[in-house]
A protein has these predicted regions:
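Glycine-rich phosphate/diphosphate-binding loops that line cofactor/substrate pockets in enzymes
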Residues: 17-30
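Charged helix-capping and loop-helix junction motifs
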Residues: 46-52
Length: 171
Protein backbone atom coordinates (compact mmCIF):
# COMPACT_ATOMS: atom_id res chain seq x y z
CA UNK A 1 0.00 0.00 0.00
CA UNK A 2 1.07 3.57 -0.63
CA UNK A 3 0.60 6.24 2.00
CA UNK A 4 1.17 10.00 1.81
CA UNK A 5 3.40 11.10 4.68
CA UNK A 6 2.64 13.77 7.25
CA UNK A 7 5.97 14.50 8.94
CA UNK A 8 6.61 15.94 12.38
CA UNK A 9 10.21 17.05 12.97
CA UNK A 10 10.09 16.30 16.70
CA UNK A 11 7.73 15.78 19.62
CA UNK A 12 7.08 19.50 20.11
CA UNK A 13 6.16 19.90 16.44
CA UNK A 14 3.80 16.91 16.67
CA UNK A 15 2.20 18.19 19.88
CA UNK A 16 1.64 21.63 18.37
CA UNK A 17 0.11 20.42 15.08
CA UNK A 18 -1.53 17.00 15.55
CA UNK A 19 -4.99 18.35 16.40
CA UNK A 20 -5.01 21.46 14.24
CA UNK A 21 -7.93 21.66 11.83
CA UNK A 22 -5.59 22.70 9.01
CA UNK A 23 -3.35 19.60 9.34
CA UNK A 24 -3.36 18.04 5.86
CA UNK A 25 -4.09 14.47 6.94
CA UNK A 26 -6.63 11.81 6.03
CA UNK A 27 -7.25 8.14 6.82
CA UNK A 28 -4.79 7.10 4.10
CA UNK A 29 -1.91 9.17 5.45
CA UNK A 30 1.04 7.87 7.44
CA UNK A 31 2.21 9.91 10.43
CA UNK A 32 5.99 10.16 10.75
CA UNK A 33 7.66 11.39 13.95
CA UNK A 34 11.38 12.16 13.66
CA UNK A 35 13.99 12.80 16.32
CA UNK A 36 12.48 10.63 19.06
CA UNK A 37 15.32 8.14 19.35
CA UNK A 38 18.15 7.79 21.87
CA UNK A 39 19.79 11.10 20.89
CA UNK A 40 16.87 12.97 19.38
CA UNK A 41 14.65 12.65 22.43
CA UNK A 42 17.07 12.47 24.09
CA UNK A 43 16.83 9.28 26.09
CA UNK A 44 14.56 7.25 23.79
CA UNK A 45 11.27 8.45 25.32
CA UNK A 46 8.00 6.62 24.68
CA UNK A 47 6.83 9.04 21.99
CA UNK A 48 6.26 6.42 19.28
CA UNK A 49 2.58 6.11 20.17
CA UNK A 50 1.61 9.08 18.05
CA UNK A 51 -1.94 10.19 18.89
CA UNK A 52 -4.63 9.98 16.27
CA UNK A 53 -5.55 13.43 14.92
CA UNK A 54 -8.86 14.49 16.52
CA UNK A 55 -10.34 15.43 13.16
CA UNK A 56 -9.89 11.82 12.00
CA UNK A 57 -11.31 10.41 15.23
CA UNK A 58 -14.41 12.56 14.65
CA UNK A 59 -14.69 10.91 11.21
CA UNK A 60 -14.62 7.46 12.81
CA UNK A 61 -11.01 6.59 11.95
CA UNK A 62 -9.66 4.35 14.72
CA UNK A 63 -6.16 3.52 13.44
CA UNK A 64 -3.60 4.60 10.87
CA UNK A 65 0.04 3.82 10.10
CA UNK A 66 2.53 5.64 12.33
CA UNK A 67 6.31 5.52 11.90
CA UNK A 68 8.95 6.78 14.33
CA UNK A 69 12.51 6.35 15.49
CA UNK A 70 11.05 6.43 19.00
CA UNK A 71 9.51 3.71 21.13
CA UNK A 72 6.20 3.16 22.91
CA UNK A 73 4.75 1.29 25.83
CA UNK A 74 3.86 -2.35 25.40
CA UNK A 75 0.30 -1.48 26.39
CA UNK A 76 -0.17 0.82 23.39
CA UNK A 77 -2.03 -0.24 20.28
CA UNK A 78 -2.27 0.33 16.57
CA UNK A 79 -0.29 0.07 13.38
CA UNK A 80 3.14 1.40 14.31
CA UNK A 81 6.64 0.97 12.94
CA UNK A 82 9.07 1.92 15.69
CA UNK A 83 12.77 1.98 16.60
CA UNK A 84 13.70 3.05 13.05
CA UNK A 85 17.49 3.10 13.14
CA UNK A 86 19.75 4.86 12.75
CA UNK A 87 17.49 7.60 14.08
CA UNK A 88 16.77 10.84 12.22
CA UNK A 89 18.91 12.85 14.65
CA UNK A 90 22.06 11.18 13.30
CA UNK A 91 20.98 11.16 9.65
CA UNK A 92 19.06 7.90 9.54
CA UNK A 93 16.38 7.21 6.93
CA UNK A 94 13.61 9.24 8.59
CA UNK A 95 15.80 12.36 8.44
CA UNK A 96 15.19 12.44 4.69
CA UNK A 97 11.39 12.05 4.70
CA UNK A 98 9.28 15.14 3.96
CA UNK A 99 5.56 15.77 4.22
CA UNK A 100 3.89 14.67 1.00
CA UNK A 101 6.37 11.90 0.22
CA UNK A 102 4.81 8.57 -0.62
CA UNK A 103 5.76 5.64 1.58
CA UNK A 104 5.18 2.07 0.46
CA UNK A 105 4.37 -0.49 3.15
CA UNK A 106 3.90 -4.22 2.64
CA UNK A 107 3.99 -6.01 6.00
CA UNK A 108 3.80 -9.49 4.48
CA UNK A 109 6.91 -8.81 2.39
CA UNK A 110 8.56 -6.87 5.24
CA UNK A 111 8.89 -3.91 2.89
CA UNK A 112 9.05 -0.22 3.77
CA UNK A 113 10.16 2.14 0.99
CA UNK A 114 10.35 5.89 0.54
CA UNK A 115 9.10 6.42 -3.00
CA UNK A 116 11.39 9.19 -4.23
CA UNK A 117 13.99 9.09 -6.96
CA UNK A 118 17.60 8.17 -6.27
CA UNK A 119 18.56 11.68 -7.38
CA UNK A 120 16.17 13.31 -4.90
CA UNK A 121 17.37 11.02 -2.13
CA UNK A 122 20.99 11.95 -2.83
CA UNK A 123 20.09 15.65 -2.91
CA UNK A 124 18.43 15.35 0.51
CA UNK A 125 21.41 13.45 1.94
CA UNK A 126 23.76 16.21 0.82
CA UNK A 127 21.51 18.95 2.24
CA UNK A 128 21.00 17.26 5.62
CA UNK A 129 22.83 18.81 8.56
CA UNK A 130 23.23 17.07 11.90
CA UNK A 131 21.72 19.09 14.74
CA UNK A 132 24.07 20.13 17.54
CA UNK A 133 24.27 17.92 20.60
CA UNK A 134 21.73 18.94 23.21
CA UNK A 135 24.21 18.81 26.10
CA UNK A 136 27.75 20.09 26.39
CA UNK A 137 28.56 18.95 29.93
CA UNK A 138 27.60 16.56 32.71
CA UNK A 139 25.77 13.27 32.26
CA UNK A 140 23.89 14.60 29.22
CA UNK A 141 27.17 15.16 27.38
CA UNK A 142 28.43 11.66 28.25
CA UNK A 143 25.13 10.19 27.11
CA UNK A 144 25.11 12.18 23.85
CA UNK A 145 28.64 11.19 22.93
CA UNK A 146 28.44 7.51 23.83
CA UNK A 147 24.91 6.09 23.56
CA UNK A 148 24.39 3.57 20.78
CA UNK A 149 21.41 3.38 18.45
CA UNK A 150 18.20 1.40 19.08
CA UNK A 151 19.24 -1.51 16.87
CA UNK A 152 22.44 -1.75 18.93
CA UNK A 153 20.69 -1.79 22.31
CA UNK A 154 21.01 1.89 23.38
CA UNK A 155 23.93 0.98 25.62
CA UNK A 156 27.05 3.09 26.08
CA UNK A 157 29.81 2.26 23.62
CA UNK A 158 32.43 2.28 26.39
CA UNK A 159 30.62 -0.55 28.21
CA UNK A 160 31.18 -3.03 25.41
CA UNK A 161 33.31 -5.99 26.30
CA UNK A 162 35.75 -7.80 24.08
CA UNK A 163 34.32 -11.27 24.71
CA UNK A 164 30.75 -12.51 24.65
CA UNK A 165 28.93 -12.52 27.96
CA UNK A 166 27.46 -15.86 28.90
CA UNK A 167 23.87 -16.17 30.00
CA UNK A 168 23.35 -16.33 33.75
CA UNK A 169 22.55 -19.66 35.30
CA UNK A 170 18.88 -20.06 36.13
CA UNK A 171 18.08 -22.16 39.20
Amino acid sequence: MLFRSVVFEDYNDMSARIDRDDLDVDANSVLVLKNAGPLGGPGFPEWGMLPMPKKLIKQGVKDMVRISDGRMSGTSYGTCILHVAPEAYVGGPLALVKTGDLIELDAEKKLLNLKISAEELEKRKKAWKRPPLKYERSYGAIFSRHVKQANEGCDFDFLEGTAPTSDPEIH
